[in-house]
């Protein structure tokens, strides 16, 4: 089922990652092609509604996937990555396949992108998505009191802003933050700390997973340990706040793999995320810290 209205269509040909595949270790061009094929299979398998509008901008859309007989189910709100400048829910709908099969309602959310909009607009949209889900997800068999927010890369940043700050009044039970830049000051996008979630923690869900590759190569020439350090930074900030969490380190996983691992039953990330989403484990286990992160910290001047 598809909602009516003027919505942004998925076209990876406009993406930098698609236009410059040789610049990347990760195979983003191949990922986008495979993702739409997998999405078609998910659409055949599960009840779904596409291009639901939660705002007036063409970017403000979300897709919902679920098993047909789902009732009072846990809910996953998933924010895609793309450096806040590219991406579309359609390229991540296939992640719903595993989660809907296990009984969750999967919401794949879009949001306004740079440079036409600001990162602050992206964050505001993440809050708006969450509010929409709370008000409407029961009609899709979801339980609004069992929401986990999840996201990869810039989507992980958005998920963290929703789950860890009290700017969003919605109660969140879980967070799965994957390979996210959390200190925007280091990226030159924002001079303030207001959009850096590790500096803005004012609440923490009951169950939290932070994951990242070690190392995690993406664009050639970039620091393959940057996201490793950022992930460990968020984990350390949560511990300092007094939170319990699971840290999942994915050795030698590129930036595509750290995204797809979320729905891969063979990945340790899937098992940790399953416990967050379904609440099927109350044991909090923190994985060993990345040795690379410790080395980098020791090399930094005071």
UniProtKB/Swiss-Prot annotation:
One of its GO terms (molecular function) is hydrolase activity. It is an enzyme of class 3 (hydrolase). SUPFAM superfamilies: alpha/beta-Hydrolases. Residues 280-302 are annotated as: Disordered. It holds the Pfam family Abhydrolase_3. InterPro entries: AB_hydrolase_3, AB_hydrolase_fold, GDXG_lipolytic_enzyme. Keywords: Hydrolase, Plasmid. The keyword Acetylation does not apply. Residues 282-302 have a biased composition (Basic and acidic residues). The keyword Hydrolase applies. Its EC number is 3.5.1.-. Involved in the degradation of the Pseudomonas aeruginosa quorum sensing signal molecules HHQ (2-heptyl-4-quinolone) and PQS (2-heptyl-3-hydroxy-4-quinolone) to anthranilic acid. Probably catalyzes the hydrolysis of N-octanoylanthranilic acid to anthranilic acid. Belongs to the AB hydrolase superfamily. This is Probable N-octanoylanthranilate hydrolase AqdA1. The lineage of its organism: Bacteria, Bacillati, Actinomycetota, Actinomycetes, Mycobacteriales.
């Amino acid at each position: 089922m598809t909602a009516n209205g003027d919505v942004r269509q998925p076209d990876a040909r406009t993406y930098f990652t698609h236009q410059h595949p040789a610049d990347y270790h990760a195979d983003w061009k191949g990922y986008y092609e495979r993702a739409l094929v997998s999405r078609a299979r998910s659409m055949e398998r599960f009840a779904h509604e596409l291009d639901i509008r939660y705002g007036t901008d063409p970017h403000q859309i979300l897709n919902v996937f679920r098993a047909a007989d789902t009732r009072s189910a846990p809910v996953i709100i998933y924010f895609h990555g793309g450096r806040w400048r590219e991406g579309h829910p359609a390229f991540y709908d296939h992640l719903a396949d595993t989660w809907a099969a296990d009984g969750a309602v999967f919401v794949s959310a879009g949001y306004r992108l740079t440079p036409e909009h600001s990162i602050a607009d992206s964050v505001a949209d993440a809050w708006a998505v969450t509010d929409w889900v709370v008000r409407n997800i029961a009609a899709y068999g979801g339980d609004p009191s069992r929401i986990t927010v999840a996201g990869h890369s810039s989507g992980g940043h958005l998920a963290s802003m929703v789950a860890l700050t009290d700017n969003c009044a919605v109660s969140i039970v879980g967070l799965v933050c994957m390979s996210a830049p959390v200190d925007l000051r280091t990226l030159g996008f924002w001079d303030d700390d207001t959009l850096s979630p590790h500096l803005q923690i004012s609440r923490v869900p009951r169950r939290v997973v932070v994951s990242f590759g070690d190392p995690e190569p993406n664009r050639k020439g970039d620091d393959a340990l940057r996201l490793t350090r950022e992930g460990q930074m968020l984990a350390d900030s949560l511990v300092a706040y007094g939170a319990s969490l699971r840290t999942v380190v994915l050795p030698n996983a590129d930036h595509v793999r750290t995204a797809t691992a979320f729905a891969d039953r063979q990945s340790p990330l899937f098992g940790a995320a399953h416990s967050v989403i379904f609440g099927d484990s109350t044991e909090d286990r923190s994985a060993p810290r990345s040795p690379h992160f410790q080395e980098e910290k020791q090399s930094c001047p005071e």
